[in-house]
């Protein structure tokens, strides 16, 4: 058996910290799956916004569509 305890020594527990106390509720739902779509739609919206952000950055870097009428000297 892989989980068998060989000796009965005292197991040390981790120290409590403020960050741990704050993050504890986030871990309480570990392994549970909410029914339905949950936050999938919200994630899709943020992914789309991030894609738009990346396209804008790329266009600025390439001095393309967004900066056609603006002289850039760098």
From Swiss-Prot:
One Gene Ontology biological process: protein stabilization
Residues with the Phosphothreonine modification: 3, 5
Bilayer topology: Single-pass membrane protein
Keyword Membrane included in the entry's annotation: yes
Main subcellular localisation: plastid
Subcellular locations according to the entry: Plastid, Chloroplast thylakoid membrane
GO cellular component, one term: photosystem II
GO molecular function terms listed in the Swiss-Prot or TrEMBL record: phosphate ion binding
Keywords: Chloroplast, Membrane, Phosphoprotein, Photosynthesis, Photosystem II, Plastid, Thylakoid, Transmembrane, Transmembrane helix
PTM section of the record: Phosphorylation is a light-dependent reaction catalyzed by a membrane-bound kinase; phosphorylation occurs on Thr residue(s) in the N-terminus of the protein.
TM region positions: 41-61
NCBIfam families found in the cross-reference section: PRK02624.1
Subunit structure: PSII is composed of 1 copy each of membrane proteins PsbA, PsbB, PsbC, PsbD, PsbE, PsbF, PsbH, PsbI, PsbJ, PsbK, PsbL, PsbM, PsbT, PsbX, PsbY, PsbZ, Psb30/Ycf12, at least 3 peripheral proteins of the oxygen-evolving complex and a large number of cofactors. It forms dimeric complexes.
Job description of the protein: One of the components of the core complex of photosystem II (PSII), required for its stability and/or assembly. PSII is a light-driven water:plastoquinone oxidoreductase that uses light energy to abstract electrons from H(2)O, generating O(2) and a proton gradient subsequently used for ATP formation. It consists of a core antenna complex that captures photons, and an electron transfer chain that converts photonic excitation into a charge separation.
Family: Belongs to the PsbH family.
PANTHER family (UniProt xref): PHOTOSYSTEM II REACTION CENTER PROTEIN H
Protein known as: Photosystem II reaction center protein H
Species in which this protein is naturally found: Chaetosphaeridium globosum
